[in-house]
């Protein structure tokens, strides 16, 4: 925003504006006039005092005595210039009551108003750092105020040695703060006295003050402008406070007409200050001056909402929302918050129009501003919901705040979304029930539904839809993942159909950041605790399982209860975190809580097989539903009374494992099978079925390896990369690898292992692509680790032979520089950590000596830098689109070996830690 520098009232100062280009006042040191040594022609060598820097802003008794001697050095009689030293000292004297101080100066004002006004104006000048000061003649010559101020300013600030930045209204010293506070309170007492004693005296004081201070607010010198604006704001606060007190008295006294007349005068003065100073300086180029103005407006609004809340104030508050200074945006929001509940009746329509106009800007602040401002904006939005309806675009933006780091912000957001959901339901019912009741409409459906059930389904689906929009927007902004966006007139619609947002890439992005997962968990907890609609795991599951809709009936009243694909997949994430929360609660003591947790876990066991069956086509939903199973305790999972549900669950997970092509789901299903295999309570038929899964996978893989080798030998030139046969082989290798990684250490070496190892070694000796070679080596390596557990080392030579062949054939490939490094380093670390008795040959030891390993590590780090350079150019991909093989290999690398998929390849400690954990776990 570009701010207006000067108002029309400062046109007489145009001749000195050009001097600002050569003197930047905020970058030069200014030392204010000393309270001890004041001279019109102050020498640079004379002692000067900074506010709150080198010396304390106070005078000892000796210094007061020296003041008499100092005044003799002045070039002009003290009758002509009045330095407000006594005024400063009395303001500093905290032992002197303000009432006594105001009474003292009130008596002076009555006896000689000219001298008091001279002291008051000189106080404003010295507070600005000006010297020399003005005389009695200058004060009374109102018509020459602009020229007089111009001369004083030029004399004070012409030389850099006479310019400073630490002055009364910016100093943080204790003395300066005392003067500022007591001066403001002094004004309240003084103005009250002069008007109560004689209104004419008050008007005379205010007219002279306004003539000088108003002109000072248009000075081209920031120090003067800031001080004068602050004094005007102080006077305005005083007037508001006095009017506030008079309003209370007017209800308790018979002199109502007199008080009303006095109140009317004060109100006119307040509006005069607003129009002449605040509404002009609120657009000043200096943020400090704008802050003073907007703070004063907020303070005065609270004191006199009836008189001050008007269109001008509302309009300027709206402009403040786009100010570059965060404090101004924050205070402007507070003003809007206050006026939304205190606006006069005559301005209600204008306020509603204003809130509707600036609602988008407010919700943008909720989402994108700094933390302290966002908190105020969200509270303001809560008030907005009482006055206006936020449109779809605003709700989409504010819904992202449910994933804010501050709990209070999440609570405010949830209140806004729940209020919007209730409003949406009310509007829908009003539109549908214009001619017929809702209960009759529901009875017309194919399967009738109660009004209460319809309301619950409608609101749950509507709220989950809003939360999903917010989650998608927040997730995209907080990660490197890029999704297409379509702009609509009233809302942003983010394409979230299958294979777009919620896909395998989404799961990869979702799992790789522990900090973000923790924030999602906290946000889901806020959703659960602040919404009665989503407080039950079973109720949300019923929404997903409800299938009594007629999809062909586009006019059905139940259509808003049908969850979209995106809502279903987001709901699966929510149910996973809900299940985690239930699991954590089970560890807390308390019989009542324990019964509640058991009931919810039983509901999970009953509903999860149905959810997996209905949504098995969605990899994301299946992934999170299976993760929910991990939160069901073994003692419940294997109970005989739930054997039927458990058998259905096992069957559904097995079907997903057999049909899926997504690596994440293969790994998750394999972990489930491993959990069953290591538990002695599981029935024999289940264990036998798991054993058959391993044998079936091994047999199928062996057949595919045979067919691939035969096909390769027939057509040596064709590498078969990219065709269906190669893709099917890689899928089979990955599926067996996922299962073997979890199960192979529980099994003894059998014939299938030996047959597979021979075929895999043969694959590596052929001219195959890097993905096939990588997948083959990975499976062979898993068999090798299983073999090392029994210290048989049957596969050691086979693996080393295959690894060396792969290195020779792919010496400069991504595979050689990354995978060989990992496998060899794992063997090296594993043999050191677990005392594996492996008879390595001389060539093997040479391949695995420390120098060779360090060289490979450096190569790996170099590739890591290449990865970072590529990913920085296009954050949607880990590698550029044309490097498809490298991208796939890189992703497989982290999915297979890195703990928590922690993608920081430049950190060697992550690599070593992951390898060490893998070796320890599988040994």
Curated annotation (Swiss-Prot):
Record-level GO cellular component terms: chromatin; cohesin complex; condensed chromosome; meiotic cohesin complex; nucleus
Domain of life per record: Eukaryota
Gene Ontology BP terms: homologous chromosome orientation in meiotic metaphase I; linear element assembly; meiotic sister chromatid cohesion; meiotic sister chromatid cohesion involved in meiosis I; sister chromatid cohesion
Location of the SCD domain: 278-365
Pfam families: SCD (PF21581), STAG (PF08514)
SUPFAM superfamilies tied to this protein: ARM repeat (SSF48371)
GO MF entry, a single one: chromatin binding
Keywords: Meiosis
Protein name: Meiotic recombination protein rec11
